[in-house]
Amino acid sequence: MKKMLLASTSTIYGQNYLEYLLEDIKILFSGCEKIIFIPYARPSGISHLEYTNKAKKVFESLNLNILDYTKDNIKEQLEICDGIFTGGGNTFLLLNKLYEFNLIEDLRYKINSGIPYLGTSAGTNICGLSIGTTNDMPIIHVKSFEALGIIDLNINPHYIDQIEGIEHMGES
């Protein structure tokens, strides 16, 4: 059985990064000792290391361990991990790197095997059949729009059905 938490965003109005998800993260990754963070979506162009450290800080506050990022052993980390978190940013960048590093099949296998998975924004987008519904700018040409296909539909994170007077960043 799949164990997934797919969130539209990592940050909601008036809160810190992942703050609204803390209790759910703690439950999802309970018992996990080697969580891998996939930083390839790079929000605001930050480095993979900076992004990993940002996630790592939050997870450490929950007594959870995110493995240190190194681009040279990402495939090995995916093999040994017992939890996966894919952060948000640009879905095209993320999917491009997953194809470039041949991680699609391994990631799909791990998630389908029941490894706990957290996706935020782009990390949620890639769980659908394709990235064809993303609102992200196509800033890089991807090999294919085909995503992981973990769920039998597409998700459009940050869907806007804004209600006047509500300050929740416009997400429905």
Spans of model-derived segments:
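Short beta-strands and strand-loop turn motifs
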Residues: 36-39, 87-88, 156-158
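Aromatic-residue hotspot detector
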Residues: 2, 37-40, 92, 110, ...
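Structural motif
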Residues: 5-6, 83-87, 118-119, 155
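Flexible gly/pro-rich beta->alpha loop and the following alpha-helix that scaffold active-site loops
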Residues: 64-116
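Active-site-adjacent pocket-lining segments in enzyme domains
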Residues: 95-118, 123-172
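N-terminal beta1-alpha1 cap of cysteine-dependent amidohydrolase-like domains
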Residues: 1-83
